[in-house]
Amino acid sequence: MSEVQSSAPAESWFGRFSNKILSLRGASYVVGALGLCALLAATMVTLSLNEQMIVALVCVAVFFIVGRRKSRRTQVFLEVLSALVSLRYLTWRLTETLDFDTWTQGILGVTLLLAELYALYMLFLSYFQTISPLHRAPLPLPANPDEWPTVDIFIPTYDEALSIVRLTVLGALGIDWPPDKVNVYILDDGRREEFARFAEACGARYIARPDNAHAKAGNLNYAIKHTTGDHILILDCDHIPTRAFLQISMGWMVSDSNIALLQTPHHFYSPDPFQRNLAVGYRTPPEGNLFYGVIQDGNDFWDATFFCGSCAILRRKAIEEIGGFATETVTEDAHTALRMQRKGWSTAYLRIPLASGLATERLITHIGQRMRWARGMIQIFRVDNPMLGSGLKLGQRLCYLSAMTSFFFAIPRVIFLASPLAFLFFSQNIIAASPLAVGVYAIPHMFHSIATAAKVNKGWRYSFWSEVYETVMALFLVRVTIVTMLFPSKGKFNVTEKGGVLEREEFDLTATYPNIIFAIIMALGLLRGLYALIFQHLDIISERAYALNCIWSVISLIILMAVISVGRETKQLRQSHRIEAQIPVTVYDYDGNSSHGITEDVSMGGVAIHLPWREVTPDHPVQVVIHAVLDGEEMNLPATMIRSAQGKAVFTWSISNIQVEAAVVRFVFGRADAWLQWNNYEDDRPLRSLWSLILSIKALFRRKGQMIAHSRPKKKPIALPVERREPTTSQGGQKQEGKISRAAS
């Protein structure tokens, strides 16, 4: 008789060993403390290269042992370990690698060192920001709606099409809030008659100022003078809110009268250029997820949440106290938050997406938007430096400093990519060290930086993708960085173009030509290095140096090729983007037939539903009514079934008036749980991420017209978090609500 085998996989010897270590009460912390002390001592004393190699291997082993446990203490430990390993590397770089033979070597070597110092500075600041993310949850509103505050919803627009703006306006009009306590305003800097007529037809209010001074900030300031609500919800004209936006977010504004701003994530229901153009795009977290999933939660702990221009609630009293929205820079949002915090106001972040908008369609548009952000943040750094002036706590200063100086990445990024060319083309050794020493000090530093980031970022950002996102725009931002630092008043606000279509596949040469040139030069350098390794008679040190720089150039070339691949723009013909959603519905036709089903995807163009129905072809469509109950509202939506076969039916909406259109908007975009799957991605694994980056390059070599087979992450249910607060007793004996803990520094 055969033995019954366990279905659980056998645990490796390493797993059993590390679990044994971690299971000992307090042992992990003792071992950790001793290990960090030993590492610090090894950094400060002179050890042989072989002994330093042992130190490096021990650090890697400690990472794997401690990293098996998932807890906040583990993350802090790994961040401290990574910082010490990086300090060890920096000590070595400053004391043993700056011995140059020529002025050229010296200049190139110091240039690389400065780039590394910037990278280490940003690494340490990022660890500081994310040391204890707050993970704020919603607070309940008072039971009596009469106690809820009044809210003005501002939707600023300039030259965007009405077809985009109307969805946001209709979504805002559908927000669950007492009708006498909310007003929706279209702030039209384009002064268009069709927008005024639409506002009158749908029940929104319309404000148009006589000029366009100070762009978006001026538009908002003008509206403040002509409205009276206690709070202001700002929505970019393409950010369509869910019905529960105010009920989920306003609890904090009511509970704490010192909160001037509550920011929520920016989520996009359409793919950005990286998602749309790369074969692995839909399996990779969007670029903005790192900021809204990790960094803003970390900022919230330090009371340094940034205002991001949309999907945010602001207290009118706080805005009026600082004289309105900041107009000195092109990023009025972050500057406004900084000014409020200088006045002693608090800010908050709620990591629940309550609205969704359109991502930039084209790569060149994406680059232009980031150039404006970079210009604006560097302007704030120059004209209102957070490290100077009064009113800010240390944590706030450092968080703002990190945000502003992060946009200096362009020059260091170019230096890192190009550095191997100094040796491959000109035999200039810009790190005065043997390849073995580089491996002993640099590789552990890189390993811990990458591996620790993977633990911290989880599924919000994958390893090596930050390099791709930065490299896409680095060569464009070099000039912006230098000019803005020297002349901070230069530059103007540019509206980001959205909502377009791409009728044919094309290669965006405008957005990629600098990196194409860069990649050609890098490939030539690699060929030069390979030629030397294969055909030249090299001594062992030169051979290792060529091998090291060839590996470096291969990594640079992979990043550059991935960046160029994003420029292969795929066709985008849909005006209405499909959104995956599983909604129970019942379909009725006018002959009395009915069937229950589940939606597969929804859009403003129609809906696909899994349901048993007779075969229907486009030549013989069927008029139906789709019945659904969402957030307590019964909906009966008229539609036309244009195709039905094999248990799946496709419908187009039959929108006859603005009331039906508003109901469809609520059905498609207004569901309270519509965007809770926004981070349904697997946790980062660096080697898998590197492989996906290599796979993304194949987009460059696909045949014209060949579609990319995107594989979306599988959906899993996510519960909406609710803050549970126990009442505490004040000194006067009265009950008061407990407050969330955050840094006091």
Swiss-Prot record:
Protein name, as recorded: Cellulose synthase 1 catalytic subunit [UDP-forming]
UniProt lists compositionally biased (Basic residues) regions at 708-717
Q: Which gene encodes it?
A: bcsAI
> Please, which domain of life does this record's source organism belong to?
Bacteria
Tell me which residues bind substrate: D236, D238
InterPro entries linked to this entry: Cell_synth_A, Cellulose_synth, Glyco_trans_2-like, Glycosyltr_2/OpgH_subfam, Nucleotide-diphossugar_trans, PilZ_domain
- Which stretches does the entry tag as region Catalytic subdomain B? 317-377
One GO biological process term: cellulose biosynthetic process
